[in-house]
Amino acid sequence: THYALVGTIAASKKYMTKLVVSKGYGLGIFLDTIPGKMQGSEENMPAMLQRCKTGDIAFVKYELSQEVFARLWQYLQEYQEKGYDKLYNGSNQPLNGGGAGCSAFGVSFLEVGGLKDLFPVDDWIIHVHAPEKLIGGPHHPGHHVSPIRLFFRNRWADEKKEPYCDITYYDPTVMFNQIELKYKRGFHANNISGMQTGNAFGFLIKCADRPAPTVPIWPAKR
């Protein structure tokens, strides 16, 4: 029997702050791969139980076949063996070793398990136009962005008026809001039903009859 309650975070919040405040990364902090680490059940379980009490969490639970679970477990082990758990942010493409935030890391399990189509997870994606002049760090060498400029900028780039860089990511707040909204509206399907744990809303997806994908877990490198 295997069990894991894992997530990825930045290895040091102080380091991230330093990159923005002292190194002038600006919005480039969302594009750069920075040191990360994986948190396990001993850290995540108390937080999850507390959030279930307060309702500050939403969830989607999948009932899997043993075959699919074994594939996901293999993915988790190999992800750590490759050292990808130490890469945070970046391109948010964990299967390509490009780094990942917590949300992209979670969704990657749905991709590996062939489960992504069972729930409208693409509704959680956010696309923004980051003004190029507010991007520093490796993506804009030699360009230092003052934190003050970030503080007073309250909008994304106007694509018709200024250069920009596209940033795409799974937004945790959107994930929470979408799941809770669907629950309250009574969203359901043949294999999907709403459920509640404490004061937390979510869904149960019964998909134990779905076979594991036959394609390799890791995409071929080009």
Task: Specify the residue positions occupied by each region the protein language model found.
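Glycine-rich catalytic cores of cysteine/serine-nucleophile enzymes that process amide/ester linkages
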Residues: 1-50, 221-222
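Exposed alpha-helical structural elements
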Residues: 43-47, 67-75, 174
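Generic structural motif recognizing short loop/turn segments at the entrances and edges of beta-strands
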Residues: 1-2, 25-27, 55-60, 163, ...
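Non-membrane alpha-helical secondary structure
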Residues: 37, 64, 68, 164-171
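Solvent-exposed, acidic/flexible segments
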Residues: 27, 38, 65, 69, ...
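A structural motif
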Residues: 61-85
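Activation targets extended, charge/polar-rich intrinsically disordered C-terminal tails
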Residues: 78-222
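Active-site-adjacent helix/loop patches that line small-molecule binding or acyl-intermediate pockets
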Residues: 49-67
